[in-house]
């Protein structure tokens, strides 16, 4: 899982690629709208909505915005129809890239994503081309400054986590998708501050890249995540930490 871990850590270190607060809230709102439309407006009976609301709260989205998004999803308020779009492609070096989007206009989203792939020397692929490389997991992020990481790792496994990854002052805890909420709640009950908790697509295997290709892929992932209609981006690239630092220094 190291390839995903390093990319997730990159996002943590530089802030989200969509650091513009307004754009971030738009993305969070779309996830809430879609979840409420699919499973109903009650968080108690809608796991996806619970996760979307929690993510919004983690990012300090005002409660009024959250409530308004729920009402749009349930039909209580008028709003554009939001659909989920999964796009697959190949980046520089043949890296597999999976793009999850929420949009009110599929044609616009596909066009924007295709343009970013083309600019990077990559290409969009047919459905199923790379999705088999990934599996859905819960990923919980914890800042580990002042914590005993060995002890925390053992606790997380005892709580039901499948794996952990530690890089510098950050730990990622991987769970089966249905177990993420439970593990998060147990961590917080023991005084652990959870930095993030998301459902992500994790590569089963990763590919090592040379420096030039790594920099190209990192730029592509950033540019994709900056698109208004894109929620998350996953790849099977394994980045060298020194190359990541170089990328940040050039950004």
Curated annotation (Swiss-Prot):
Its main location: cytoplasm. It comes from Dehalococcoides mccartyi (strain ATCC BAA-2266 / KCTC 15142 / 195) (Dehalococcoides ethenogenes (strain 195)). The keyword Cytoplasm applies. GO terms for molecular function: DNA binding. Belongs to the TACO1 family. It holds the Pfam family TACO1_YebC_N. This is Probable transcriptional regulatory protein DET0444. GO terms for cellular component: cytosol. Signal peptide: none annotated. InterPro entries: Integrase-like_N, TACO1_YebC-like_2nd/3rd_dom, TACO1_YebC_N, Transcrip_reg_TACO1-like, Transcrip_reg_TACO1-like_dom3, YebC-like. Gene3D superfamilies: 1.10.10.200, 3.30.70.980. HAMAP family: Transcrip_reg_TACO1. One of its GO terms (biological process) is regulation of DNA-templated transcription.
